[in-house]
């Protein structure tokens, strides 16, 4: 069993254990599609085994393949697309983001690496070894000054600094930021999704196994728990912050939690849990206009070369 497959199995088992803890929720679940001129579901290549998604302002979307590192690029308005980055040995694609310079940053899972591609051509631009030991590089967010990567097995974030005009750094400039403060490492899958707030001055992370949310000071690594009034987002995977509204995908729960954050990010309230009959272990989330798009990773379905995979659109208003 390959390291990446072992990690995914661990993730699935960990999430299943957490199902009971998250079954009782105060906020009601709802299901809704909108904008009938946009596809409700987008078909990905059979056998693709997707995980992460990124969408640009023009509706171009990117979805990565866990076991091969391939990236599928398409248009959310038509639902059509093609493979932009071919898979290759020694690569993986978990979370991904596109920056303002048209570059695709990809978290490399159990490879311990980060990969950067030209988003338009798919041409490799750089790769970075983030971790030397056992790790799982799970998600990424790109600010004006750095790309930040999470590690689900270690209490650390990795910083890939960007130059004044967005220039990519050398390997020796990549640093690790130890997490301190309220965050405590637990057994299983820890830090997963990440986003930034306040123009990159604060980072927000979710801890999958505990369902807790934290802010992170990117200068010091100090974490502060976001008080949800006793609620949690167990099985939290990808996250998306729009203004003061935070969306958290709860993968094996087949839910997306919508959380209204206080202006200082110290507390928030779960206002609803979005469900959809088309959800099948959704993992990550991105938006286009008022629409949310989630990737069905289907972790509970044994993957085969003919297993179908989809991206599902739901109302994000």
Can you say where each PLM-predicted feature lies in the sequence?
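Conserved beta-strand positions in repeat-built beta-propeller and related beta-rich domains
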Residues: 61-68, 98-99, 104-111, 148-153, ...
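Asp-box/WD-like beta-propeller blade repeats and closely related beta-sheet repeat scaffolds
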Residues: 112-146, 150, 154-156, 179-180
């Amino acid at each position: 069993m390959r390291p990446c497959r072992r990690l995914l199995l661990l993730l699935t088992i960990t999430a299943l254990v957490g199902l009971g803890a998250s079954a009782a929720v105060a906020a009601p679940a709802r299901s809704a599609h909108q904008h009938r001129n946009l596809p409700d579901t987008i078909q990905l290549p059979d056998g693709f085994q997707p995980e992460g998604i990124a969408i640009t302002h023009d509706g171009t979307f990117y979805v990565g393949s866990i076991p091969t590192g391939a990236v599928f690029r398409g248009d959310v308005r038509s639902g059509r697309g093609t493979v932009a980055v071919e898979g290759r040995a020694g690569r993986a694609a978990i979370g991904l983001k596109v920056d303002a310079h048209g570059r695709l940053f990809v978290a490399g899972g159990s490879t311990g690496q980060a990969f950067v591609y030209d988003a338009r051509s798919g041409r490799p631009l750089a790769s970075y070894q983030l971790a030397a030991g056992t790790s799982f590089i799970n998600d990424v967010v790109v600010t004006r000054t750095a790309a930040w990567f999470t590690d689900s097995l270690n209490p650390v974030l990795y910083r890939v600094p960007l130059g004044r005009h967005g220039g990519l750094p050398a390997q020796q400039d990549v640093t690790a930021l130890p997490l301190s403060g309220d965050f405590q490492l637990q057994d299983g899958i820890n830090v997963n999704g990440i986003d930034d707030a306040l123009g990159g001055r604060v980072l927000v992370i979710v801890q999958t196994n505990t369902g807790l949310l934290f802010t992170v000071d990117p200068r010091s690594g100090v974490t502060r728990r976001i008080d949800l009034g006793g609620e949690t987002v167990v099985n939290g995977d990808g996250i998306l912050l729009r203004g003061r509204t935070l969306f958290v995908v709860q993968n094996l729960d087949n839910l997306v939690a919508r959380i209204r954050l206080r202006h200082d990010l110290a507390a928030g309230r779960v206002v609803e849990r979005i469900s959809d009959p088309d959800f099948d272990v959704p993992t990550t989330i991105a938006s286009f206009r008022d629409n949310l798009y989630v990737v069905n990773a289907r972790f509970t379905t044994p993957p085969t070369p003919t297993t179908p995979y989809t991206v599902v659109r739901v109302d994000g208003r």
